[in-house]
Amino acid sequence: MSQPRRTSRRRAWTVLTLPAVLCVLAACSGGPASGSGDDAAGPGRKASPTPSGPPGTLFDAFHYSGADDPELSAHGWQVRTDGGGPGIKDTWSTAGAGFPSDPTAQGGRAMQLQSSTDGTQQGTKQVEVQTTGTNLFTGTFAARVHFSDKPASGRNGDHVVQTFFPISPSDSSANYSELDFEYLPNGGWGSVGPRLDNVSWFKADPPDRVNKTLKQRLEGWHLLMITAVDGKVTYALDGKELFTSSGKYVPREKMNVHFSNWFIDLPFTGGPRTWDMKVNWVYYKADQAVSQADVQKTVDGFYGAGTHYVNTVPKS
């Protein structure tokens, strides 16, 4: 069973045009998932231009100082602050978006999405971070993501959803497209957790989608991959294929990538609690199916060269 469609997703985000300069990249290395993590500069630094690199490639290791870092927006990212759903309506906030050092992350740094609630709408903050270029279509989407099975603080039991998904910029688009990884450690909508839902959408309203569920605890780091080529979408977790969709359940227009951490409902009050989701890095290769091994080899090469950001995907 997949989630009910996330309705009333209002957006007020703009596409940023970025200059490009030459950046020499070291050769890719097939070594282990490691690398040096340079500290991000302060929020007052000047935003750097887009480096060049392998064609049709997006990579970000999330080396930013915070949600107000000018390089975050210059690199085409936006932290959501508008209204609407999914989850607890009108609770989207930049407060939960951070980029702390993390010894468990490749390169020693990750993006943290921390949602919090005390069981009331007024005491709830959800977090979502997305690209704004609307230029990602077919190809390979990959991200190293840390899921949480229990809150970082407070009582367990919330129906939290930790997600990675490419999606159309408008829910009402005639060519609506959405491809979901959704982890529900405690279940939701009447289902029992833990569960990882993969969902391919054709239409948002009325909902028209296909899905498959993996019932397994996934606390920790995982490599999530979506390959959308040749009229087929394949979802994989740590190199294992989970689900394939085809026919009308494939991308039909260019999308943005989103990461979000949100609550389905508020099942109880009685004290604050926080839930963490982390993203080590994100990678996209346009129009090509890339294996897990080659994705990791390319990412290792970026880290080895000290390259934290690449975007050579043609603009819309």
Identify what each model region corresponds to.
Residues K248-M277:
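Flexible glycan-contacting loops in extracellular carbohydrate-active proteins
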Residues Q162-S200:
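Glycan-recognition/cleft segments
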Residues N198-W221:
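Short, aromatic/His-centered strand-loop micro-motif at the edge of beta-sheets
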Residues F62, F141-A143, G220-A228, V233-Y235:
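Short tryptophan-centered beta-strand motifs in secreted/extracellular beta-sheet-rich domains
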Residues L25-G157, Q162, N280-S316:
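Low-complexity, Ser/Thr/Pro/Gly-rich disordered linker/stalk regions
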Residues M1-S34:
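Secretory targeting and sorting signals
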